[in-house]
Each structure stands twice: as C-alpha cells, then as structure tokens.
Curated annotation (Swiss-Prot):
GO terms for biological process: L-histidine biosynthetic process; methionine biosynthetic process; purine nucleotide biosynthetic process; tetrahydrofolate interconversion. Keywords: Amino-acid biosynthesis, Histidine biosynthesis, Hydrolase, Methionine biosynthesis, Multifunctional enzyme, NADP, One-carbon metabolism, Oxidoreductase, Purine biosynthesis. Belongs to the tetrahydrofolate dehydrogenase/cyclohydrolase family. Catalyzes the oxidation of 5,10-methylenetetrahydrofolate to 5,10-methenyltetrahydrofolate and then the hydrolysis of 5,10-methenyltetrahydrofolate to 10-formyltetrahydrofolate. One of its GO terms (molecular function) is methenyltetrahydrofolate cyclohydrolase activity. Gene3D superfamilies: Leucine Dehydrogenase, chain A, domain 1 (3.40.50.10860), NAD(P)-binding Rossmann-like Domain (3.40.50.720). This is Bifunctional protein FolD. Pathway: One-carbon metabolism; tetrahydrofolate interconversion. Its EC number is 1.5.1.5, 3.5.4.9. SUPFAM superfamilies: Aminoacid dehydrogenase-like, N-terminal domain, NAD(P)-binding Rossmann-fold domains. It catalyses: (6R)-5,10-methylene-5,6,7,8-tetrahydrofolate + NADP(+) = (6R)-5,10-methenyltetrahydrofolate + NADPH; (6R)-5,10-methenyltetrahydrofolate + H2O = (6R)-10-formyltetrahydrofolate + H(+). The lineage of its organism: Bacteria, Pseudomonadati, Spirochaetota, Spirochaetia, Spirochaetales. Pfam families: THF_DHG_CYH (PF00763), THF_DHG_CYH_C (PF02882).
Length: 293
C-alpha cells in the first residue's frame, strides 16, 4: 500500500485565499487586521517561523508589527510591551514566539496577553472556554489538524484516535477537539508513562504523532490503513544541505507510507496549516473587536 500524501501546503493556500476575501471586505469598512509579533533572541528556528507567519499575513492583506528583542530582554520589559499592545486598539492580536530565554517565564507572558488578543489560544481563559465547548480562539496546530482531516474527507465519527504527546500546545487541546460532537472520535492520549505503546498505537484509525522526537513512530507501530498525522518538526544534520540540516517529522516517513492509507509529510503537512489558522484567528479577532461578526 502506498499512502495518499495529505498536501497541507495546498489546503492551507486554499484557506488563505478564502481569508483574503474576508480581509478585503472588512478593510472596505475601515478595519485593517494587524498582528503584533514578538521575537526575543536570535534562535534561527524561531526567526524562520516568524518569517513564515508574517509572509502569510501579508499574503492575505493583513499587517504585522514585529518586535525583535535582544536575548537579554527581562521579563518585566516584555510584560511592559505586552501591556502597551493590549491597550493599542489598532493591534488585533498578539503573538509571542516560543521558546523564550530562560530568564522569562512563558506562563507569565501568556497570561499577560489580553484573552481577546490571544490568537495562539494559549491563555488560561481561552483554554477553559475550549474545554467547556464555548466559542474561543482554538490553538492553531490542533485546529489545523482538524481542518486537514475534514478537508481530506477522513471519517472521524466513532474513529479510534491515538495522540502520542500531551503538550499544552498540541496534545491536550487536540484531544478536546477530537471529542467535540462535530468530530466525535474516541481518544487515547499517550505519553512517556504509557506502557506497551506499540499495542496502543496499532489500535488507532487515526494516529497523531506530536512528541518532538525525530522518526520515533515506526511502521510497525501503525495499523494497516490508518491515517497518520505527523505534527513533529525536527532538525537533523544533513551535510548535503546548504543550511547543514533538514526537517523530519516524528514519524519514520517512507516505511510508514507502505502501511498508512494517508499521511502528512514534513515539511508541507501540518506546518502550513498552523500558520493558516493563526491568520484565521487574527481575522476573527479583528472582526470581534470591531463588531463585525
């Protein structure tokens, strides 16, 4: 069996095209959607992610205000900037690129963002609303996974979903979304304390790999015909590349393609969907703040 490759880049491009039409409509009413992006330090991966996000914003007609702060920035300095952006009515969303330098507590930073501008969906208020099924900003990567499944026609009702990874950014919120009535899957979340992991993953109709370990999920951990969603983005050394590295996922891709019925690649799988959902959340924020919903 050769798995269908789920083209996240194409689906994300279609979504951005739809968003661009909505942006034109609200710009005609005098609203310019704007996202504040804060990058602390010079981490190359973070710089690359920020570039991808700002490029997507510009593509759909949104503005960004990017703040590049030195590695030595203190927590108080960052919180002061966030307070100013919270009060700025021309800023619809605030994104602080993670990870942050060790002297800054990421939880304190996330909690400082106005929940109405929390387009990442990480603020405790928005996490609570998500858990209760209330309307809120949905974390971008989990939302992107759900959108991919729906757009590719994957049947989720009654499906056994196994998520490997329990992070606050992906695993936990995705488990909630999978249980929602519009998805209606039966969910198992695996982690470092899970016993007999392969026995669990081989039960999955839909297997989501989100633990941040390169090629951790092997072909013998996948049920024949399962749909595999690879959330991982890992840099591994590759002397043949100009950059000196290449990106791989949490799934051992080529062997998995012989077992799965469909699979997301890395790159051009879940990653573009994450950015598209960030852009979508920024549009929602701009509409809400200007009474245009």
């Amino acid at each position: 069996m050769s798995a269908k490759i789920i083209d996240g880049a194409r689906i994300a491009a279609d979504l951005r095209a739809d968003i661009a039409k909505d942006v034109e409509k609200i710009k005609a009413k005098g609203v310019q959607p704007t996202l504040a992006v804060i990058l602390v330090g010079n981490d190359p991966a973070s710089q690359s992610y920020v570039k991808g996000k700002t490029n997507a914003l510009h593509e759909v007609g949104m503005n960004d205000r990017t703040f590049r702060l030195p590695e030595t920035t203190t927590q108080d300095e960052l919180l002061k900037l966030i307070k100013e952006l919270n009060a700025d009515k021309l800023i619809n969303g605030i994104l602080v690129q993670l990870p942050l330098p060790k002297q800054i507590d990421p939880d304190a930073v996330i909690e400082a963002i106005n929940p109405e501008k929390d387009v990442d969906g990480f603020h405790p208020v928005n996490v609570g609303k998500l858990l209760l099924g209330h309307d809120t900003f949905i974390p971008c990567t989990p939302h992107g996974v759900i959108h991919l499944l729906k757009r590719t026609g994957v049947e989720t009702k009654g499906a056994k979903v196994v998520i490997v990874g329990r992070s606050n950014i992906v695993g936990k919120p995705l488990s909630v979304l999978m249980m929602n009535k519009d998805v209606n899957a039966t969910v198992t979340v695996c982690h470092s304390g899970t016993k007999n992991l392969t026995e669990v993953t081989k039960e999955a109709d839909i297997l989501v790999a989100a633990m941040g370990k390169p090629r951790f999920i092997k072909a013998d951990m996948i049920k024949k015909g399962a749909v595999v969603i690879d959330v991982g983005v890992n840099r591994i050394d590759d002397s043949t590349k100009k950059s000196g590295f290449r990106l791989v996922g949490d799934v051992d891709f080529e062997p998995a393609c012989e077992i799965a019925s469909a699979i997301t690649p890395v790159p051009k799988g879940v990653g573009p969907m994450t950015i598209a959902m960030l852009v979508a959340n920024t549009l929602i924020a701009a509409k809400r703040q200007n009474g245009l919903e």
